[in-house]
């Protein structure tokens, strides 16, 4: 009986210590030089958006100055930002990807 009480106490403590990870928005920012087709390609490659979703997000970026590509835990968001920015530079585009806390 004593052991059961200890196990329940440990389970409660572990559950109370587990917190969901902080989530971050990955954002693409508008610029006057990156072609719309390239933005759509980025959204399809790095965020697995279909053509319609990618087009909708691209138009949001174009009209509102930025658009959310997805919401991820920090490590994944940071990796996507780095990958997108490297891909844009490799293709000679100034497209800027950033993240902010959700």
UniProtKB/Swiss-Prot annotation:
Subunit structure: Binds to the N-terminal domain of the chaperone ClpA.
Protein task: Involved in the modulation of the specificity of the ClpAP-mediated ATP-dependent protein degradation.
Family designation: Belongs to the ClpS family.
UniProt source species: Shewanella sp. (strain ANA-3)
Taxonomic placement: Bacteria, Pseudomonadati, Pseudomonadota, Gammaproteobacteria, Alteromonadales
NCBIfam families to which the protein is assigned, alphabetical: PRK00033.1-3 (NF000670), PRK00033.1-5 (NF000672)
Pfam families referenced in this protein's UniProt entry, alphabetically: ClpS
One Gene Ontology term from the biological process aspect of the record: proteolysis
Domain of life: Bacteria
Listed HAMAP family: ClpS
UniProt name for this protein: ATP-dependent Clp protease adapter protein ClpS
């Amino acid at each position: 009986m004593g052991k059961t009480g200890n196990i329940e106490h440990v389970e409660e403590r572990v559950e109370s210590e587990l917190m969901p990870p902080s989530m971050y928005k990955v954002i693409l920012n508008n610029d006057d030089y990156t072609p719309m087709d390239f933005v759509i390609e980025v959204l399809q490659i790095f965020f697995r958006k279909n053509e319609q979703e990618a087009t909708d997000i691209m138009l949001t970026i174009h009209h509102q100055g930025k658009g959310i590509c997805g919401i991820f835990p920090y490590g994944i968001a940071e990796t996507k930002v780095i990958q997108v920015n490297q891909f844009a530079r490799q293709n000679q585009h100034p497209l800027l990807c950033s993240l902010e806390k959700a």
